[in-house]
Amino acid sequence: MSLCNLAKIRSVAIKAVEKACIACLDIQKQLISEDTINKKDQSPVTVGDYTVQALVINELLKGLDEEYPIIAEEDSKTLSSQKDVESKVLSFFNRYSNESFVESQLSSLLDKGNKKKDLNSSNRWWTLDPIDGTLGFLRKDQYAVALALMEDNKPILGILGCPNLPVSKGSTEKGCIFVGLKNKGSFMIKLSNLDQEEPIKVSNQSDPTKAIFTESFVSRGFGHELNQKISNSMGVTAEPLKIDSQCKYAMVARGDSDCYLRLTQLDYKECIWDHAAGHIIVEEAGGIVTDFKKQQLDYSKGFKLENNVGIVCSNKLLNDSLFDSIKKSIQF
């Protein structure tokens, strides 16, 4: 099997995520209101999830010569039973893809992302989280379209579309795409100017007491409590940056934050699509991503990181201090 040129794959993947980001902004504008927020209505993010998955898969299929297996979150079964949601998804998809699909074609496309393993026969495969950060999406806050290309069960290309993320710290302009390609570095692209790529690097902060952590808005399990324990052990004084989704990886890769830790429960296993894209982007920006036992992330065991305990992401310079404090703060 001939393999596509990685530069072409990178270009097509960026375009796919860009289309998805623009669709997400439109879906938020049209479907999310104060009323849906107050009612905790999940339907806008459901429309977004399915629309983005269909758009990204369609762009990959149209733009690339080789069709790699795709592991994504959604399939068509649930959607087909929600006709009102399905009609909205079809409308948004056709608008942003310039297609004229009917329901059956949409279902077939969505199910292209239903490669429920075994991927051992495939050297390369995609993993996609259409909207990572459901709560952020519904609040019109931070969320990400997360796409990664895997090779031999390791991420070699990551794209994070962050439609609501400021283009720089303190900027009022929002909308970024982050891309990392193995051995080629990481870059940020503004949604307002897709022709210009800006190289990004992790911070050079080496003083543990000055480290800036990033964590989720909402604590799950003992996550925030443990993070505070570890940061206190390091002598950190700054408040953590609270942000939803894999945008946390982008913050570390761009140098806005120095560390991102995630451990909610000792027995909880992370989904591969929640980390693959951010992982390679941080590494190519000069950072490091392991688990709490300092083990490499193992993407070979299905949909979850079955062999790993949590996530430790840093600018690399702070890694020794982080793990010294981790050892003092939790027993495995």
Curated annotation (Swiss-Prot):
Please indicate if the UniProt record lists NADP as a keyword.
no
| Binding residues annotated for Mg(2+) 1, in chain numbering | E73, D129, I131
Binding site residues for AMP: S245, K248, R262, D274
Keyword entries, A-Z: Hydrolase, Magnesium, Metal-binding, Multifunctional enzyme, Nucleotide-binding
Q: EC number(s) per UniProt?
A: 3.1.3.7, 3.1.3.57
Q: Where does Mg(2+) 2 bind?
A: D129, D132, D274
Q: What family is this?
A: Belongs to the inositol monophosphatase superfamily.
Give the function comment from the record.
Answer: Phosphatase that converts adenosine 3'-phosphate 5'-phosphosulfate (PAPS) to adenosine 5'-phosphosulfate (APS) and 3'(2')-phosphoadenosine 5'-phosphate (PAP) to AMP. Is also able to hydrolyze inositol 1,4-bisphosphate and inositol 1,3,4-trisphosphate.
| Record protein name field | 3'(2'),5'-bisphosphate nucleotidase
